[in-house]
Amino acid sequence: MAKKSLIQKNKLIFKNSKKNFKIIIIKNKLKKKFTFNLLLKIQSIKKKKLKTKFINRCYISGRTRSFYNRFSLNRNLIRKIGNFGYITGIEKSSW
C-alpha cells in the first residue's frame, strides 16, 4: 500500500491544478497590465503542487510502476483480476 503522505500529495496536486488552469484562462483574457500580477501568482506556486508532479497509482495496491491508465491498475492486478474474468474484454491468452 502507498504511504498516506504520497496519496495526500496527489490529492493536493489535483485540487490545485484546477486553480492553476483558471489563472491561465483569466490571464489570456486580460490586458497586459494585469497579466504581470497573474504571472507572479503562477510563479509563486510551489513546485510540489504542479500537475506535472502527479504520479499515477494503482487504486488497489498503490503501486506506481507498470501502471495501466485504461484500467487504473498495475500489471500484476490486471493479470490476477483478468484471469478470473472480472475485467470485460480481457481473456487469458493461450497459443
From Swiss-Prot:
InterPro entries cross-referenced by the UniProt entry: Ribosomal_uS14
Keyword Transferase: no
Entry keyword Ribosomal protein: yes
Single GO molecular function: structural constituent of ribosome
Record-stated family: Belongs to the universal ribosomal protein uS14 family.
Purpose of the protein: Binds 16S rRNA, required for the assembly of 30S particles and may also be responsible for determining the conformation of the 16S rRNA at the A site.
Name of this protein: Small ribosomal subunit protein uS14
